[in-house]
C-alpha cells in the first residue's frame, strides 16, 4: 500500500455528510461541520434529498469547509454499503449524474465543488476492480478534470484516477480497522469500527506522523494518507474528531483541505 514515510505537517479531515433523507435524520451535521475541513456530500442515491443537499452545501459554506460529491450505487434501503451488480457503463452514468446534481446546488450557492469520493460499496469495489475504478475516474474527469479524487493508497481507484489525469488524494480512515494487506476490515469483522475516541485518535496520529497503522494482526502497515476520514454516522463522531484535532495539534500538525493554504 506504499512505502513508510516521515511525518506530514498538514492533513485534511473529511466526513460523509448530508445523508439524511426526508424525515430520516442521519448524522449530526451541524455539530460535525465546524470540526472538519472537507465534506463528502451525499447526492441522493444512498442518502440526501434535494433539500438536504442544498442545506448541507450552505452549511459547508458557512464554516469554510471544502465540498465534495459522495456518489455510489443506487441502493437507498441498503445505504449503499451492500455490493450491487452494475456494469461499468451504469456506474459511469450514475456517478456523472450524481456529481452533476450536487454541482447544481454548489453553483446556486456560490460554492466550489472540489472533489469526489465514492461511498460505501462503490468505494470498496472501485478500490479493487479496475473496470469499475475506470468508470468512476472517467465520470469525474469528463465532468471536470480539475476535481480531485479521494481514493485508498495503492488501489485500483488511485491508479485509474492518475491514468485519467486527475489529482488523487490518498485517504486513510481514523475510525476503521485495517487488515494486514492495508485494506479496511469488513464491517462484519470484530474490530472493524474503532468506537473509542482514544483509539481512533492514536490511529490518526500514526498515519499522519509515521504513515502507518497497526493491522488486526499486530503488524505495522503503510497507509500514506493525505486526508483522514471519520464517518458521520459513527456514534462518537464528535468526541473522535475533537480528540483527533487535539492529538494532531499536539504533534504540530495543522488541518486543512487539499490545495487550501
From Swiss-Prot:
Which GO BP terms sit in this record?
A: carbohydrate metabolic process
Top EC class for this record: hydrolase
Q: Name one Pfam family in it.
A: LamB_YcsF
Q: Which UniProt keywords apply?
A: ATP-binding, Hydrolase, Nucleotide-binding
**Keyword Transport attached:** no
Which Gene Ontology terms cover its molecular function?
5-oxoprolinase (ATP-hydrolyzing) activity; ATP binding
The set of disulfide-linked cysteines is: none
Q: Does the keyword Nucleotide-binding apply?
A: yes
What EC number(s) does its UniProt record assign?
Answer: 3.5.2.9
Q: Which reaction does it catalyse?
A: 5-oxo-L-proline + ATP + 2 H2O = L-glutamate + ADP + phosphate + H(+)
Q: What family is this protein classified in?
A: Belongs to the LamB/PxpA family.
Which PANTHER family does this entry report, sorted A to Z?
A: 5-OXOPROLINASE SUBUNIT A (PTHR30292:SF0), UNCHARACTERIZED PROTEIN YBGL-RELATED (PTHR30292)
Q: Give a short account of what the protein does.
A: Catalyzes the cleavage of 5-oxoproline to form L-glutamate coupled to the hydrolysis of ATP to ADP and inorganic phosphate.
Cite the record's note on assembly.
Forms a complex composed of PxpA, PxpB and PxpC.
Q: What is the protein name given in its UniProt record?
A: 5-oxoprolinase subunit A
Tell me which species this is from.
Symbiobacterium thermophilum (strain DSM 24528 / JCM 14929 / IAM 14863 / T)
Give the encoding gene's name.
Answer: pxpA
